[in-house]
Amino acid sequence: MGYIIKRKVIYRNDRTGKKIKLPALFTESGIVISHLRFLATKQGRSQSWKEKSVFSVKLLLDYIHVNENTFERTVDLLQSFSDCLNVGTIDYNQMHDPSGLFWKRRDVKYANNILAHITLYTDFLARQKGYEDNRENPFRNATLAEQKLNWCAYYQRQANVFLNHLSSTTEAEKQCIKIRTITGQLQPKVENEKVKRFPEDKFVDLLYRGFIRPYSNISMHENERLDYKSIAISMLLNKGGIRKSEFCHIYSSDITLHPVNDGALVRIYHPSFGSSPDPQYKNRETYLKTKYNLLPRTKYQLSERLYAGWKEPLLIDSQYYFEVIFSPVSAGKDFLEVYKKYLKYQRVPPPKLAPHPFAFTNQKGEPETIKNFQRLHKRAVERIGLIPSKNEGTTEHGHRHSYGYRLAQFGFSQVEIQKAMHHKNSNSCLVYIQPTSDEIVEKMKAIEALW
């Protein structure tokens, strides 16, 4: 009986000592080596992206497996697969699914993302030497997973059949692309009415009433009662506008005194290419590997504790870093005061047998993680009477929305906001600065009152 399972593997494509850990798919015929090679060519992609690619190809293999001898033409199988992603495989009238897949209906955006991942992989397959050899047998008679996947790649290459996942006809016209036979559904354009920014009037409460250390009480001194680490990180998010993953990449040496405004100067470097704090090392990846036997945190697997993402922000220097721009500027001084208290009273130094350069640590002295900070933030939000919810802006990402909207309220231009938020595209900041319908109505009322 056939099966498809995912496992972590160590991949090496030459005789050097270089090796990487990748997620891989195994079938009854063995490892799907072509997809493993595909992932190995995508080292610049995040671990999250690689996991989604594996998941997408596994879905296709699962679908091929349960539909053995069902389709004469590969294009018909691919069309049916695309349809099943969108509508599911369950007959809800009979509460039955003969295929055993039991796929529920997927959101259009999610289904199209799956198709996009498969298309990238089949494009890769179609470019490989020898892929013609794996199509010696008709698709219906093909036995190996690799052969079936190469048939999918063949149809993709010959007739652009697999998918067109653009979200609008206007975008398609601009791109002037060839429309493929099998297309993802068009996703309706929706402007999110609920602006997901953290409530401005609740931020101080979050810091000084929400972030309370375990087993503390009101009678204790603030150095024992307040959680300075979580306060400092939240200030970086809300007043510095950084993404929640970016604090994980900050070294202790990256936080210094600003030479002009007496606040903190915080630089966030690229996890791999950023300049090393020790000039004898070429970059941060070499520095981490050589001095600490660690990897850049982007290169750990998603399931590993040290993993942290990186959204490719706009870097401003050949040393591959950007500077945190505090808003208001005085927040840089407030952050520095909190950070100094964290270092003096609460930071647990790294273990002697497991040293590291990271600024924020947990109770064991290990590098702090996004997951642990999310837990602390959730409890702090609940402690001040709010409900942790992305739609209410009360998750960690709501702080970045607050930062962008605050800059817009201060009158900064779109280009200035782009630079402050370190976006490569000037339009990326628009989602952070859009007003709600209620705010537009209130502005209309104020203008009309002057008539």
Residue ranges: model-predicted function:
Residues 1-180, 439:
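Charge-rich, intrinsically disordered N-terminal extensions
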Residues 64-67, 218-220, 350, 365-366, ...:
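Short, basic (Lys/Arg/His-rich) helix/loop patches that form interaction surfaces
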Residues 128-132, 237-262:
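Short, charged phosphate-coordinating catalytic segments
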Residues 151-212, 276-290, 318-330:
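DNA breakage-rejoining catalytic core of tyrosine-based enzymes
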Residues 209-239, 244:
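Basic, Lys/Arg- and aromatic-enriched nucleic-acid-binding interface segment
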Residues 215, 250-335:
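Conserved tyrosine-mediated DNA breakage-rejoining catalytic core shared by Y-recombinases
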Residues 421-446:
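Catalytic-site neighborhood detector that most strongly recognizes the C-terminal catalytic loop/helix
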Residues 448-451:
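C-terminal secondary-structure termini that scaffold catalytic or DNA-interacting sites
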